[in-house]
Amino acid sequence: MDYDVFEALFEQEWGSLTEEQKRRFRAVDALYRDWNSKINVISRKDMDGIYAHHVLHSLGIALYLLNRRPEVLEKWKAGGVKVLDLGTGGGFPGIPLAILFPKVKFTLCDSIAKKITVASSVASALGLENVECVNARAESLPV
């Protein structure tokens, strides 16, 4: 699935993305392809499925909120919410969700430094000011 198919499917369910969201989602593919050529972030056999298997899958959380917990979704849209993505790996589901919900503060945490390096680099390249990446084990996080 390429970006255009992703966007069409997204808009069927949600409505239009902003131009900034489109720019960011479109950039995801190239950013992860670049990182994946250096370290194995996503299965190399699955890179062509990044939108279907990683981005849309990540946004399934938002779809669940839309269908089952609309009151929570409204809080996410309004902002002031903090979300912890524990075991984020290279940034899924946190980065796609951060693109979709720019008013939500996302903390992406993983114990593997190279994966957090990828997530941090991708978030920075996308200009996601609502993302913080932390290299730590869950039990070491302050409560």
Q: Where does each model-flagged region fall?
A:
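Class I SAM-dependent transferase core
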Residues: 1-78, 121-131
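Conserved SAM/SAH cofactor-binding pocket of Class I
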Residues: 59-143
